[in-house]
Amino acid sequence: LCELEIDCDISKLPEASTLGGGTAVPQPPVTGNTGGTELAVGEEADFKAAEAALEAGDFQRAVELFAAFDQSYPGSPLAAQANLNRGRALDGLGDTREAARAYLASFSGNSTGPVAPVALFELGAALGRLGQVSQACVTLAEVAARFPAAADPVASARGEMTALGCS
């Protein structure tokens, strides 16, 4: 605490020793799951509450909760699933246009993630219901092209393409 003493000159102080008086010991590298993402406080609970509303068929409440989740936790690792579920809730309300936007947000938010094949299928199917058949066909064809190993979404996309008369 040289600065508290009147006659102290910091430039003339000897080099300080390490704290504890010993030499520094190199620490081993940190191992384990440091690359994982952590959820914010309440994030998982908020997601589960929205999911419960969807599962209970309370579509309006689910839409509100998933929208609030999206606003409260931008960049969440659950964002793609939240947007997919919001789309399903909007479909439950009969709002196909907004559902399509939610499916697009889900896919765009993580186009290689675990829900991407389903989100892309749902987007294509919603476009078909909106009468945008050519865009629906292109989008549905992309499911198999991008995610050939995703058996259920690929089969669903092919079925929807047949129903829409895609070539």
Give residue ranges: language-model regions:
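Acidic, proline-/serine-/threonine-rich low-complexity intrinsically disordered segments
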Residues: L1-A53
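Short solvent-exposed coil/turn linkers within tandem alpha-helical repeat scaffolds
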Residues: D70-L78, F107-V115, A144-S156, S167
